[in-house]
Amino acid sequence: MGRVSGKVALITGAAAGLGRADAIALVREGARVCITDVNAAAGETLAAELNRGSAGSAYFIRHDVRDEDQWIGVIAEVKRRFGGLHVLVNNAGVVVMGTPESTTLDQFRLQQSVMSEGVFLGCKHAIPVMRDAGGGSIINMSSIASHLGYPVYFAYSAAKGAVRSMTKAIAVHCQMNKYNIRCNSVHPGAMHTNMVETSAKELGIPISAFEQMPSGLGQPEDVANLVIFLASEESRFVNGAELMIDNALAVQ
C-alpha cells in the first residue's frame, strides 16, 4: 500500500481492459485518478466503484483522445480538482485488423489518430502541468506489435511503433530541459482483455489458442503491476526505456 501516495494520475482508455486494471491499482496504492474513455457508462461505473472503496479517489471524464480541445479541457480539470498532475498513462487504443493490402486509408488513419496522435496530444499538454508540479512519470502503452511483423495488425503495429519512437524523444526532451519527468513505453504481449477476445473471434480461433502458446496469456493486472512501478519513485532512474511484458514472446 502507498507506493504512489499523494500522486495524481490521468489514465486514458480506462473504462475496460488494461486501463481499468491500471486505475484500480493506482487507487489501491494511494493515488487519486482521473479516468477517461469514450465509453461513458463503463467509465462512470468504474469511478463509482473506486470511490466506494476510497472516497474522492477517482472521477470520470468522457474523452476522445483524438480531440485536442478535449485534451486541454481534461488537463485543466485535473489541475482544478487535484492541483496538479504527476502520472500520465496513455492507454487508449483501438484495433482494426488488416494486412498492408486489405487495410483502408480510413482504417489506417483511425488507428494513427487514436494511438499516435492521442499519445502526442497527451504528452504535449501534460508536460507543462507535470513540470509545474515538480515532475512525474509518463507511461505510454505500446505493444510487442511495435517490434514484430504481424501482417494482420498492420496499421496497429505502425501506430504502436510511433508510440515507441515518440517515447524516446519525449524522455530526452524532458531530461535535457531538467523537467524531472520520465517517459517510458510498456509493450504488452497477449493479455486477456476484450480487445484480444475480439481479435480471436475475427481470426476464427478460441481465446484458449492464446493460452496454449508457449508464452501463454497474461492478465491486465500483470501490466498494472508494471505501471505502478513506473508511476512510483522506485523507477526514478528508468527513463526512455521499452519494457516488454510478454513472457518472452517477442524474443522467441
Pin down the residues of each PLM region:
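Short C-terminal tail/terminal secondary-structure segment
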Residues: 3, 148, 228, 239-252
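Residue(s) in the substrate-gating loop at a strand-loop-helix junction
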Residues: 143
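Short, small/polar-rich loop/turn modules that mediate ligand/substrate recognition or access, typified
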Residues: 177-182, 238-240
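Substrate-binding pocket helix/loop in short-chain dehydrogenase/reductase
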Residues: 99-100, 104-109, 138, 196
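A conserved structural motif in NAD(P)-dependent oxidoreductases
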Residues: 212-223
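Alpha-helical segment proximal to the catalytic Tyr-Lys
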Residues: 128, 172-176, 236
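Active-site helix of classical SDR
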Residues: 123, 159, 167
